[in-house]
A protein has these predicted regions:
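Positively charged n-region of N-terminal signal peptides that target proteins for export
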Residues: 1-4
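Bacterial N-terminal signal peptides
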Residues: 6-16
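Extracytoplasmic cell-surface/polysaccharide-interacting catalytic and binding patches
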Residues: 18-104, 108-201
């Protein structure tokens, strides 16, 4: 099975995302009303300081369209993961930051949709923004994407930082879903300031 590299932040399994300076807006505005399984919660009900912008519910992602299974803008996690996220968000707020979520629970249908996209070599419309320095065939082979995700268990999130005062993204030297060596947390391809920002997470 093919696997990908995920940056995991401590016990909370926070997948670090490198956010650029684009404004943090919800990707999709239709309310999400899934059948909530026992042990899962909406993140905004537990951690109100967390700001959500589900990229896979819209078009600003490496596939270039909403993924199967995403129908709204409310993030879902297992209860314990959401409670851990609440503690992290409160600590960051005291430092002048907000925690922004790009992805949380990911339906398995979305994972299958990503695999389907990966098999279509002709679909290269998002290459210049999301994987400019690698061939699409290596997106899976170089471990950027995998055919199983901890997101589907509701215990992982893609996150970045926002300034609490303005709501603007903190400069991480990249953007969410940038499939590139520079996205590695400790990459030397970004500036020292951008690396310091990453280390906050």
């Amino acid at each position: 099975m093919k696997t990908c590299v995920a940056a995991v932040c401590g016990m909370f399994m926070l997948l670090v995302s490198c956010s650029g300076s684009r404004e943090f807006k919800p990707a999709f505005n239709q309310p999400l009303q899934p059948v909530m399984q026992p042990g899962f919660v909406y993140v905004d009900q537990v951690a109100p300081l967390v700001k959500t912008n589900l990229k896979y519910a819209g078009y600003d992602n490496f596939v270039g369209r909403p993924l199967d299974g995403y129908h709204g803008r409310r993030a879902i996690l297992r209860t314990q993961a959401a409670q851990a996220l609440k503690k992290v968000s409160e600590d960051l707020y005291r430092q002048g930051y907000l925690l922004g979520i790009y992805d949380a629970y990911r339906p398995h249908t979305a994972v299958l949709d990503i695999c389907k996209w990966g098999a279509d070599e002709g679909d290269q419309k998002m290459k210049s923004r999301y994987y400019p320095h690698i061939d699409k065939a290596k997106v899976f082979g170089d471990h950027y994407v995998r055919d199983f995700s901890e997101h589907s268990r509701g215990v992982a999130v893609d996150v970045s930082l926002l300034y609490a005062r303005t709501g603007k993204p903190v400069d991480m030297g990249g953007h969410h879903d940038l499939l590139d060596p520079s996205s590695a947390t400790d990459s030397t391809l970004v500036t020292p300031s951008q690396r310091r920002n990453r280390m906050i997470l």
